[in-house]
C-alpha cells in the first residue's frame, strides 16, 4: 500500500521520535559509528520542538493509519535546510524516504527558496544515492568533531555573548561570506543566550549560534573561527561540523585533542556560492 503524507502535529512527536531514534540507531550501528540520539525521548523532544517551531515545516508518512516516517524543512532563510528525515527501519528502501524528500523539495520550490540544502552521513551509501538522484550535488566534506572544551584565548580576538545590537553586523558578515543571511536563526540564538561574537580591532569579525551540531558559525578568517571554538564551554550534541578542506583549523583542532566522530557531506540544490571566509554549518546546512 502506498504511503499517505500529511502535515506533522504535536501529537506525532513521540511516535516520530521513536522512529527517528530507531532509524538513525540502526544505520549508525550497522556502520559502527556513534549514535546521533541517545534515546527515543531525546529524539522526540527535538522533533516536537521542530513541529511547534513557526520556522519549520514538518511532514509525516502513514501506511495503514500508522506513522512510518517524517521529514522537516527549516524555512527561516531564503536558503532552506532539510532534515532530519527518518523512516521506520522495517520499511526502508520501499520508497517512503523518496516520497518524504519530494514533498519538502516541492514545498521549498513552491515558496520560492533560492537554495535547498542538507547534510548527509558520508558512510550511508543509500542516502547519498537517493539525494543525488533527486538533484542534490555534493559540495563540501565535513568532519564532526568532539572533545573537551579547549579554553583557549587569542590576544586581540575578544569573544563575548552576542546581543540584539550585534545582529545587523552579523547578518552583513554572513551575507559577505555566503551571499545571504541567517538572521532569524541568529535572533533565536541571541534570545536563548547561545550566540557569541568575536571582535578584532573594534569590529565584529565572526559569530556563532553555538559551537554545536544544530548551530552555525560565520567568520572572516580562520583566527576568528579558532577564537570562537577555543572559547566554547561545550560542543553540543554529537559535535560541531568543520569543513574538512579547512586544513589549518582542522589540523589545529586535532592537535588540541579534538577527535573526528564521523564524516558528513554538504549537498545542495540551487543557490550555492563558495564561501568567502571561515564557516561551519548546522547539521541541516
State what each model feature region is:
Residues 21-46, 167-188:
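Conserved GNAT-fold acetyl-CoA-binding loop/helix
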Residues 56, 68, 77, 82, ...:
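Short coil/loop residues immediately preceding or within conserved phosphate-binding loops
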Residues 133, 142-168:
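Surface-exposed beta-loop interaction hotspot
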Residues 1-3, 54-58, 62-64, 89, ...:
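Intrinsically disordered, low-complexity, positively biased terminal segments
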